[in-house]
Amino acid sequence: MKQHLTYRLLSVIPAVLCGAVLAFVRIPHPASIAVAIAAAAVCAALAVLAFCVRKQFGSELAGGSTAVTFASSIVGLLLLACFAVSVYSLYFAPPAERIAVTNTTVVLLADLFSLLAAVYFLLSALIPSLLANQGARLLWAMTPVLYCAFRILSDFIATGTMPLANGGGYHILGMIFAMLFLLCEAKLIAKKGKPFAYLACGQIAIVLNAAYNVPLLADFKGATTAELLHGVMFLAFALYIAVRLFTLPYAQPQTEEAIEQA
């Protein structure tokens, strides 16, 4: 049991600690090249760690624990809040306060999948029996992946010719690895996933989202309500990822018959 707990801690704690350190270093030095290089080195080291511990975990998701239910509920509620704020800012705010967007179609798709992803997380937390069918669950599990994809595209277009300025690299890459983690989760639901990809993408997503969003929330004066809300939401994604990694089931020992067949 102690060995199993050690591997569970290794799957989460290094990423959380590294993300916290990078975040607090970036608060006074948001554009530091040295910090960016350190972040790249940390992500590479976490990928190596994920490779080393991959055989200790199974290729399936754990049942709904209290921690997973809580994290899923938080993410679902924040996705709903992001949907509501975005729709209000685009269509119902006073004309002088409405947000002008470069590509309306991409924003609408991001909002649509934000709503659908919110329903998925809330159903997973509150009424998991509605997702008992594997096909239906897999279909719903793709909604947060598509939300992240259109959110990445929307933010990339909105930043114009300088998408990596002002910490944008952490932002875009953090969303990309969150999307990849969610895609790996969908593959685990489909019984086709691998623990290494799930662990590596999850740990890197935790680091990059913490490194970007904590400084954003700490120095919130120049950010809009929508940007701050999205920052909180991707920190909630980081919490969800950490909980999922910590509750990932251990690999089942092979029986002698299975070993002989292999």
Regions found by a protein language model. Give the residues of each.
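Juxtamembrane "helix-exit" motif on the non-cytosolic side of transmembrane helices
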Residues: 21-29, 84-98, 152-163, 212-222
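Alpha-helical transmembrane segments of polytopic membrane proteins
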Residues: 31-46, 69-87, 101-119, 166-178, ...
